[in-house]
Amino acid sequence: VFRFTSPRVLAALVAAGLVATGLAAVADGSAQAVTTGATATTALSSNWYAAAPYLMPLQNDPPDPTAVMAATGIKAFQLAFILAPNSGGCTPTWDGTNPVSSDTTVGPMISAIRAAGGDVSVSIGGYNGTKLGQVCGTPAATAAAYQQVITTYGLHAIDFDLEEPEYENATAVANEIGAAQILQQEDPGLYVSVTTPGTTSGTGWFGEQMLDQAKTDGFTPNNFSIMPFDGGFNGAASQISALEAFNTILMNTFGWTSAQAYAHEGVSMMNGRSDSGEYFYQSDFQTVLNFAESVGLARYTNWSVNRDLPCTPVDNNDQTSGSCSSVAQQPWDFTKYSVLFAGATPPVSPPTSTPTSTPTPTPTGSPTSSPTSSPTSGPTSTPTGGSCTAAAWSSATAYTGGAVVSYGGDRWTAKWWTQNDTPGGPAGVWTNDGPC
């Protein structure tokens, strides 16, 4: 059942002229939801909204989300983006061109996701287009526009993606943060994330101003997330350094301990080649995931499911694409890390003695060969039980559940999908079958 709109937000809806498009006011000041093409459902546990990767439902060759769910085990997607109309006005649209009030495409997609056992969060803002916070005159009017989206789709989660040029406009930021606070108050249980650009020092001056606005308003979302890409980053180590710096910024802004700050901090990465030519591989996602789990990070997501496919050619001629990653991968490799963050196990493929396919070698910068020496904990000599016949483990190869490799003189079997997780390592994804 849809959330009912409170009198406070209803008044703003009336003022904004939104009632006729999705709500029918009743005499006592409440509102009734009308049929919209997206069936409401019970909320998922918050870990799925925290792990939901971004997906553009109308652009960049959107994949079938239910097929991605079946292949990976992912249960939630972050649908992007809600913007102001390109023609002007304070009403919500998809990508500035498709009014939410007359949507016939995204609603059925959401219903299909829910029918498959999943759900969505909707992201507002992004890098391109005019944001509602820029054109709606007040936080209440901005909230009213977003409330239409929440009511139309029966949402349990929403993301505020505050980027350039909007977050350079103090009034627009005040409208967005104020709107987020209103929605949080008027829609009990609504999961709210705030996402902003990351820098090698955490976030920039405008990001810190946004945090100051939230502190002034007394607003605390489920998390503040940074995007550590397109800013001179070089792999996972630089991203982790940025997250540690952002943790310090959150501590200093809100007076939190480091643990409290991490519990309100998130990361939104970009898989493959970024807009500025940085490269992020599966091994980088695994390393950041390990860090996120070790410190209790509140959110782990990425841009985007549309891009979680191999290009042809694999490197896409050193170009960034909205519909493939420009690095060697199998379909949905990066989405599976979100599944792991949510605490689930990706689906296991039928057992096989060797990987079902050998990915094309990754571009320079990603591990491409097995270690040159065995771990110190492994045997120092070849066991007498015979020579290993299974293929040697390689950090560059993606293995499915049941795959068998040799490493350190032992035979190992993968428990589930894995890449760059050393047999016997802390990830625990390999079963030691003994000497080979």
Place the predicted regions along the sequence by residue.
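Secretory targeting and sorting signals
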Residues: V1-V34, T368, T376
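Chitinase-like catalytic core of GlcNAc-active glycosidases
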Residues: V34-I226, D230-F254, Q260-G266, G272-D284, ...
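Acidic glycine-/aspartate-rich tracts in secreted/extracellular proteins
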Residues: L58-Q59, I82-P85, Y127, G272, ...
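Conserved active-site loop/cleft motifs that coordinate metal ions or position small ligands
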Residues: G266-M269, R299-S304
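Short, low-complexity, polybasic intrinsically disordered segments
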Residues: Q282-R299
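A recurrent domain-boundary module in secreted/ectodomain proteins
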Residues: D308, P313-G365, G428-C436
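Tryptophan-rich substrate-binding surfaces of secreted polymer-degrading and adhesive proteins
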Residues: T360-C436
